[in-house]
Amino acid sequence: TLINPLYYVYFCRKITAPTTWEIITEKFKSFESNDLFTRSSIPVRKDNSSNIAASVMNWWEDFEQKSLALALEYEFMLSTDISNFYPSIYTHSFEWVFISKEDAKKKKNKNNPGGLIGSHIQMMMNNQTNGIPLGSTLMDTFAELILGQIDIE
């Protein structure tokens, strides 16, 4: 589903309102509290290096070496396939990232960012509650909210 550009701008303004954006960024910061999870910005830029070299070194230092260290520490590894993740996201699950599923069902704290995100994505998807639009950095960011919460739980 392609997002209407006017609606995209409106949605961006809603979620970047100072109070809402602060809650969203705090949630992302909470994902960093577990040393088993690593996040990385792409592309990686370092002084006096080409972007390709910096990206390779970042991968080597942050992912490859850490994976080897964890492989020595743990007996098992869970590997998942999330290739069908975007089309299967339930829009109401954005609320569950910020408040409990039970509170969301009781309609408590309807002003949380998850409710805002879920309802706007649902409108973009012709009021369907399954799936989010593909190909947008904004949707990648929101999908990461759900994946981060899954990692924590």
Task: Please report, for each region that a protein language model flagged, where it lies by residue.
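Active-site palm subdomain of RNA-directed nucleic acid polymerases
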Residues: 142-153
